[in-house]
Design a protein with these regions (language model features):
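Surface-exposed, glycine-biased beta-strand/turn segments
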Residues: 4-64, 86-87, 95-100, 110-169, ...
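Beta-strand/loop nucleic-acid-binding surfaces
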Residues: 68-75
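Aromatic sugar-binding surface patches on proteins
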Residues: 175-202
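Short coil/turn segments at the loop-to-beta-strand junctions that recur within blades
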Residues: 75-76, 121
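Short beta-strand edge segments in extracellular beta-sheet folds
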Residues: 230-233
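Short nucleic-acid-contacting surface segments enriched for D/E, G, S/T with interspersed K/R
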Residues: 78-86
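Histidine-centered divalent metal-coordination motifs
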Residues: 72, 98-104
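Glycine- and acidic-residue-rich phosphate-binding/metal-coordinating active-site segment common to enzymes
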Residues: 106-108
Length: 233
């Protein structure tokens, strides 16, 4: 997988644009493979060669087997297949004021969170943990987070009695059979978003009695918030 350090050389494709849907979020029954940005104009995130362009889609090939994908974009007149483009070159205009931006690693066959390469969200707030629920029969722990701050969400960890037992990172999405999985095979869409307004972690087994459960939420720049809870089984 391409390291975050090398991806950081890429530019945000819409300076001043607003992220309205984050990577890995639940959308239309599957994970969002990129980010949705509210903006009028779209610019090349890095120099490369136009691999494909159509009525509302542009794909640009870069070094290191990386593609940047721009959906819901009407291409500029100077954009055509195989043409070389420079970093920051205007690619086109959005349709309806919103476009989808994705980064795909051809070698690793997975989508990479575009926010690994931009400081666009440095000032975003971390989400707050509103509560926990536990299904002892299924070993499912649900974490309820506030919507505010989800754009900057990088990792959620579950710690039971001081030991990390599960970790969910918003780094990559890949295809597994007919579905998409987030970060690790354990996190399929139907499991993670099975309860409305919650992230559900499978395979969490709590001991009978009182359990100390911590939820550690981290953003892309290492800021953390910790929620301390107790669950009695």
């Amino acid at each position: 997988m391409m390291a975050a350090a090398s991806l950081s050389a890429y530019d945000f494709p819409a300076p001043g644009g607003k992220i309205i849907s984050s990577f890995g979020s639940g959308s239309k029954g599957e994970f969002n493979t990129g980010i949705d940005i509210q903006a009028d104009n779209v610019f090349a995130s890095e120099a490369g060669e136009v691999l494909y362009y159509g009525p509302d889609f542009i794909a640009v090939a870069h070094e290191d087997s990386i593609l940047t994908l721009y959906s819901h974009v009407t291409a500029s007149e100077d954009i055509s297949k195989d043409v070389h483009i420079s970093r920051g070159q205007r690619l086109g205009r959005t349709k309806g004021g919103v476009f989808h931006f994705a980064v795909y690693d051809l070698e690793m066959e997975r989508y990479i969170n575009p926010l690994l390469m931009t400081d666009n969200i440095k000032k975003s707030e971390l989400p707050k943990v509103k509560g926990l629920s536990y299904d002892s029969a299924g070993g499912m722990l649900s974490v309820y987070l506030s919507d505010k701050g989800l754009q900057g969400l990088y990792m959620v960890q579950i710690s039971v009695d001081g030991q990390v037992v599960s970790s969910l990172g918003f780094r990559t999405v890949r295809r597994k059979g007919d579905t998409l999985v987030l970060d690790r095979e354990a996190f399929e869409y139907g499991t993670l978003y099975g309860r409305e307004g919650a992230f559900t972690f499978p395979g969490i087994h709590l001991n009978p009695g009182d359990n100390s459960v911590d939820v550690i939420v981290t953003d892309f720049y290492g800021k953390k918030v910790v929620f301390h809870g107790r669950i009695t089984v």
